[in-house]
Each structure stands twice: as C-alpha cells, then as structure tokens.
Amino acid sequence: MSESGDQDVPERIEVQRPIAADAAAIFAVVSSPEGHVQIDASGMLMSSTGEPATAVGDTFVIHMDREALNDYPLGLYDVTVEIVTYEQDREIAWTIVGQIKPQIGHVYGYRLEPVEDGTLVTSFYDWSDIHEDWKAMGIFPVISEDALRGTLGILDRTVRRGYPRPA
C-alpha cells in the first residue's frame, strides 16, 4: 500500500526465457526494424522502414494497426522507435515517438545474458516515467505480460529458423 492508502500498482513488466542461441543472433533480430515486426505478439506491428539500430539515438519507423487490441479505433498509423539504450549483444531499449502530444514516455527493451545453453532473454516494458497526462488516463500497461511472453516465444522460433538470413 502507498502512503495514501492506495494499492501500489506496478509500472514495469519483465518476463524471461532462455533461448538456445548466442546473444549476437538474438540481438540481430531485436535491433532490426523488420525483426520487431517478425516477433510481435500483439498483432499491432504491420511493417517497418529503416535500418537496424547501432547506437543510442538511432530511429526507425514502425507502421502500426491497433485493430488487433480492439480498444481504440486509430486505424493505420506510424510510430518512430528511438533507441535509448544500446549495448551490442547485451541490451537494447527504446521509446516511441509519435504524432501525439505530449509524448508518452514508455520504454520497451531486451536484456541478454549468456547462460550455459544459450542466452537468457529478458523482455521489459516500463511505463513508470510516462507523462502525467497519460498516467491520468489509466490505460497503461498497453501491452500485457502475456504479450511480452508470447513475443519471447516467437523470438525463440525466429532465431531457431535462422532469421535474419544473410543477403
């Protein structure tokens, strides 16, 4: 309970899954715009434009359709992914920069840790620093723990199948 008597509500979700692949193979997927689309379990990510991230500040565009969530009729729209944490083969995190104001401020990401048979992948979604206007709406989290867990399963399958394939 908080001091005001309200029950504390978590503002971050983390899920983990061991994947039988090295961190470089996994990072190649999670740092790639097309990789994001390939592994999305929410059904919102339709396609992408841009190059794989290589540093903090890099951006790429994801073409979205929120219809899969059946909550807000936004139709087709684009968001810009801006990388806020980048450690090659270890961690990547990003925020979403959209056309709406104020910017939301939620962060998504992956941490990769070597383990005996591959890599332990942690997927996280953090909305603790969202703008107060958005916090007051009570619509967070946008993505559920189940969706994060599903994305890790798809990531595992995607890496096992050899994505991304060399050109």
Where are these regions (language model features)?
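Short, solvent-exposed aromatic-acidic interface loops
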Residues: 95-104, 124-131
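A short, structured loop/turn motif at beta-sheet edges
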Residues: 20-24, 51-55, 84-91, 111-120
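Hydrophobic ligand-binding cavity/cleft-lining segments
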Residues: 1-56
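Glycine-rich portal/gate segments that line the openings of hydrophobic small-molecule binding cavities
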Residues: 48-97, 157-167
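A conserved amphipathic terminal alpha-helix motif
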Residues: 126-167
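Hydrophobic pocket/interface hotspot
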Residues: 25-30, 36, 60-62, 83, ...
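Hydrophobic/aromatic beta-strand elements that line small-molecule binding cavities or substrate pockets
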Residues: 15-17, 78-85, 96-98, 106-114
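Intrinsic-disorder/low-complexity, polar/charged segments enriched in Ser/Thr/Lys/Arg/Asp/Glu/Gln
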Residues: 10-18, 59, 78, 91, ...
